[in-house]
């Protein structure tokens, strides 16, 4: 999640503390079992597994994930992503908008999770999702990763120059590649319009534009441009009845798909949104 896959050891241990607090105080499920190791021990364990390496530095040791370990670490992340997907979505929402009405946060979380539910096998119903979100927000407030501004009923990010703001952004980074894939797919559908693309054509367009994004911008997670991930998401959209495939093979949709698209814009940086929109326009004109 960090630039160049490298982190200051102290900062890394702080992030581990945040994850452990979320796992303990707002667990994904009652059966969730947290890690009994403290953050320093977790880092040491990862070193022994050789999935990270240490660089000694007078200003503080750096911990880095070697390039050759990136596919393995992506696999590790994807295996546990459902556990922290909801905190990550909330972190993305607030860190990229600075100050949001709490009701808007709840609405956006519900819309985004409706798209992620099948892909990540998320367990919550509508009411359960609201309760889980509130529990997570309480933990993030207690850890100063969120704050209540003066206006009642709003949520705000920490000050941009603070360490807490950096940590909130890092928390959101875990879900960013998935959200970017979703936004690219929805933006392409919106660009072409209902009833103009077949499923294979949409998969090909997503794959081709994702490859280009990976080369031009910082869309550099190993699995971001993989065609199979887009194919799976499009299949989930059809199963969830966000898309309807007619006998002639064309994909149709209505405002039920455009509403999550609007919500998805809230969780990405301006740079990511603009890059994806530009590529979607280019793909639509091709």
Residue ranges of model-derived segments:
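Membrane-interfacial terminal anchoring regions of lipid-handling membrane enzymes
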Residues: 1-286
């Amino acid at each position: 999640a960090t630039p160049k896959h490298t982190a200051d050891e102290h900062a890394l241990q702080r992030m581990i503390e945040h994850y452990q607090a979320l796992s303990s105080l707002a667990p994904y499920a009652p059966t969730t079992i947290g890690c009994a190791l403290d953050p320093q021990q977790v880092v040491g364990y990862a070193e022994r597994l050789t999935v990270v390496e240490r660089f000694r530095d007078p200003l503080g040791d750096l911990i880095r994930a070697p390039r050759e370990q990136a596919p393995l670490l992506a696999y590790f992340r994807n295996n546990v992503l459902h556990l922290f997907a909801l905190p990550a979505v909330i972190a993305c929402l607030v860190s990229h908008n600075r100050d949001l009405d709490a009701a808007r946060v709840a609405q956006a979380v519900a819309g985004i999770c409706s798209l992620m539910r099948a892909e990540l096998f998320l367990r919550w119903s509508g009411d359960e999702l609201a309760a889980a979100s509130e529990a997570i927000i309480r933990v993030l407030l207690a850890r100063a990763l969120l704050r209540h501004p003066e206006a009642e009923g709003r949520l705000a990010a920490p000050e941009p120059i603070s360490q807490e703001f950096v940590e909130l952004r890092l928390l959101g980074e875990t879900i960013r590649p998935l959200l970017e894939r979703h936004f690219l797919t929805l933006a392409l559908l919106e660009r072409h319009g209902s009833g103009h693309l077949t499923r294979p054509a949409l998969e090909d367009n997503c794959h081709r534009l994702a490859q280009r994004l990976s080369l031009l911008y910082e869309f550099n997670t190993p699995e971001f441009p993989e065609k199979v991930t887009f194919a799976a998401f499009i299949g989930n959209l059809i199963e969830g009845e966000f898309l309807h495939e007619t006998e002639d093979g064309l994909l149709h949709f209505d405002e039920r798909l455009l509403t999550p698209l609007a919500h998805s814009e809230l969780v990405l940086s301006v740079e990511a949104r603009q890059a994806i929109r530009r590529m979607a326009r280019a793909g639509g004109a091709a």
